[in-house]
């Protein structure tokens, strides 16, 4: 017999996951210090954010495929590992390796899309009677992350 948690626990866990992965939208907070430290222009950093958002969208597609083939737990674990790799790469960026910045945040954006898709689809599926409430609370967590962190 498979052990499952209550739907309210799933909603709370989903909110926390979205709160953590919403840092994607905090780019403007840490792009200025990056530009100052490495001497990069705001146009270059803006292009990097564009790459992040494109990767996020592609990650949503990948997340859909993974969640259908595997389950949501494994999809989130894969996304978490991808985040670890992406932010690990970002920690090694130097002024001369701007390509590494793009690569690192492409992986992080992909990871965010995977986790986003797996989390929203799973939690909303558990709330057939309150889909709007569940998805609204999750998206509130995603948006509130820039405020909290």
Task: Give the label of every model feature segment.
Residues 4-26:
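Pair of pore-lining "gating" transmembrane helices in MFS-fold secondary transporters
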Residues 22, 109-117, 143, 147:
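Small-residue-rich segments within alpha-helical transmembrane domains of MFS-like 12-TM solute carriers
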Residues 25, 53-61, 147:
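Residue-level signature of mid-helix packing/kink "hotspots" within the transmembrane helices
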Residues 34, 114-127, 134-135:
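Intracellular juxtamembrane helix-capping segments at the cytosolic ends
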Residues 59-72:
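Helix-to-loop junctions at the C-terminal end of transmembrane segments
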Residues 81-95:
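C-terminal ends and interior cores of transmembrane alpha-helices
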Residues 98-114:
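Hydrophobic core of transmembrane alpha-helices in multi-pass small-molecule transporters
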Residues 128-149:
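Glycine-rich segments within core transmembrane alpha-helices of 12-TM secondary carriers
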């Amino acid at each position: 017999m498979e052990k499952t948690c209550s739907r309210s626990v799933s909603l709370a866990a989903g909110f926390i996951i979205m709160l953590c992965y919403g840092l994607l939208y905090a780019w403007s907070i840490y792009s200025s210090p990056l530009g100052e430290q490495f001497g990069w222009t705001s146009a270059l950093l803006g292009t990097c954010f564009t790459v992040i958002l494109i990767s996020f969208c592609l990650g949503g597609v990948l997340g859909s495929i993974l969640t259908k083939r595997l389950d949501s737990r494994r999809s989130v674990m894969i996304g978490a590992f991808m985040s670890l790799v992406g932010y690990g790469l970002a920690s090694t960026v130097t002024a001369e390796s701007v390509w590494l910045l793009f690569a690192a945040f492409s992986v992080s954006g992909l990871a965010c899309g995977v986790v986003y898709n797996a989390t929203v689809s799973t939690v909303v599926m558990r709330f057939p009677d309150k889909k709007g409430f569940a998805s609204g609370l999750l998206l509130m967590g995603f948006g509130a992350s820039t405020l909290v962190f």
